[in-house]
Amino acid sequence: MGFYEGDDNDANTKAFNDKYIKDQKFATAPFWNLFPKLRDIDEYDNPLLPLPFNFNFRDLGDSALAMASGIPTVKQFDKCEELKGQSAWTTQGIWKCLVPSKAIPPLPQLDFLLPLEEIKSDKSHSHGLFFNDFNLFLKWRSHMNRLQKQRIKTRTTAVEPLARTPEDLMLNWDDLHLGNDAEYASADGSKKIVGRAQSISTTKDSNDAKPSTVKTEKIYFDDGTVDITTTTTSKGSSPQVKHKVVSVDEDN
């Protein structure tokens, strides 16, 4: 169904979230997209929660601020009640009224009205993700904030200057390129890769003339974990491999 049910591991929800992040909608949504087109607003309509000043929403035209808080106006809510609709919120926190088919036809041409059955049957979220509880919307926003921070951290790690020695220069951009890792899953398919990072450094022990090369590979997953593999090699010795899984907060 087109509703978010609080499970970020649901296959359809994960696919929607991955595409949402990859398309950068979460980070770059235009400011005015936060507000709906309130074509039915007039000077007699008021916000459901009172404002500490007089305000005529009609003065703002088609892109009114009335819905910035995700709360309908009195007129909108009354219309929704009249049509036996139910409240829902979009991924941008915009309030909508989902109206059952018995109220159709004709469904009034108002921007905040949507057909309930069409949204409920939209399993692939082609019409977007909807929330029938504002707390679920806040939970989803929190989850998406973590994913966005994780991706930003991954990209920052990837583009940091890594070259320190001639050996380091062997690392090329292809090794660091993140591409569309959100489309790829872990080996067991339980979680998706959202980014990669790799670094190579050369160290030299003061008590040993032999330099050691340390290669660190990191894979970032959508559940907030990081798979870290460190391979240390030195001339005349077998490679030493260390592997661990940590949270993105523990990743230095």
Swiss-Prot record:
InterPro entries: Mpm1. It is a peripheral membrane protein. One of its GO terms (cellular component) is mitochondrial membrane. It is found in: Mitochondrion membrane. Signal peptide: none annotated. Residues 230-252 are annotated as: Disordered. Its main location: mitochondrion. Keywords: Membrane, Mitochondrion. It holds the Pfam family MPM1. This is Mitochondrial peculiar membrane protein 1. It comes from Saccharomyces cerevisiae (strain YJM789) (Baker's yeast). The gene is MPM1.
